[in-house]
Amino acid sequence: VGFKAGVREYKLTYYTPEYETKDTDILAAFRVTPQPGVPPEEAGAAVAAESSTGTWTTVWTDGLTSLDRYKGRCYHIEPVPGEADQYMSYVAYPLDLFEEGSVTNMFTSIVGNVFGFKALRALRLEDLRIPPAYIKTFQGPPHGIQVERDKLNKYGRPTLGCTIKPKLGLSAKNYGRAVYECLRGGLDFTKDDENVNSQPFMRWRDRFLFCAEAIYKAQAETGEIKGHYLNATAGTCEEMIKRAVFARELGVPIIMHDYLTGGFTANTSLAHYCRDNGLLLHIHRAMHAVIDRQKNHGIHFRVLAKALRMSGGDHIHSGTVVGKLEGERDITLGFVVLLRDDYIEKDRSRGIYFTQDWVSLPGVIPVASGGIHVWHMPALTEISGDDSVLQFGGGTLGHPWGNAPGAVANRVALEACVQARNEGRDLAREGNAIIC
């Protein structure tokens, strides 16, 4: 009796097709492309092993713990229809592998090490099922959809936004002027672009002050609550929180964070600050396409969206289906419902691999942004629904008469589309006629 050293095939330990998943397991759906000559069972088991308790060889200390309790298990494999040498590999992870309330730890475990594994030609994480027992360890969005509507006193329609352009180079005063013109023209929000932080041409404190002035002036003249997504993203968490504190002192309703470049730890810290201090939190997904664009490698955005809902954010950019940035309608709507709804049934046609119960975690408002303009309004109103932000940057500031007329055009088009929808008219068929 004793320790038997040596290398074992992963599938002998980690491929368990007889395993019945538990309600407390985190479930993952991986698209696996094995190297030539590697059986799919071995590839799937390798993913389960390397993202949980395994390493490349048997180790003496395996005998000091219970692998049956802690190991990840590849419990099902199926070929991907229409794709040669690609397989969906389903892995179950025991909940005890993960720190409570930490998206950072969850991702470090599940995707931190396996993507460079030499037995795999490519690997993509398509979806995660997060069990209620784990969700209950997260605060989630600072406020959620209903609380945001109540704070802003805006009901029965999507809200309208605009990213200030040019994104870089404006002085703080000219930037604030553009914010005022857009809000005065009828928009609900304006927005810092994702790479506007605190550069030599416009330091963050100056921008915050001039934008706050624009917000209060526009509110006084319109009688509506307005906001500007003040980007608090910074080089350190301490600096980020300092900017959030200043925004709160100015009395503005909403700030912003780039959650992928800033990181999940920073984002969760900021979300907690926002809930404690009554600030809404807008999330930009800068860098997402580096991670999710390839069809056979990386992480699908629906996983990043779920992670954001856990980490915390009241808005997140979600694609448009129309416009300049890539998005497929059914797939985009799939992760939109994962952001907004409380209980989502499995639906492979929309890319939803698992039934997800959010157990009343607040919802996130999807933001449609990127190359959209006033003629897209009927489609956006129909596709996105009321609980959304429709964000027109060039589609507002590019109006031939200027910023304020561009904002007026967007607001009038939205009001017309909402009224037509409420009257029972078909936006898909009559869209252009409605806003002419």
From Swiss-Prot:
Example GO molecular function: ribulose-bisphosphate carboxylase activity
Pfam families: RuBisCO_large, RuBisCO_large_N
Cofactor(s) required, per the database record: Mg(2+)
Enzyme class: lyase
Location relative to the cell: Plastid, Chloroplast
Entry annotation: catalytic residues: K165 (proton acceptor), H284 (proton acceptor)
SUPFAM superfamilies linked to this entry: RuBisCo, C-terminal domain (SSF51649), RuBisCO, large subunit, small (N-terminal) domain (SSF54966)
Name this polypeptide is given: Ribulose bisphosphate carboxylase large chain
Organism: Byblis liniflora (Carnivorous plant)
Gene: rbcL
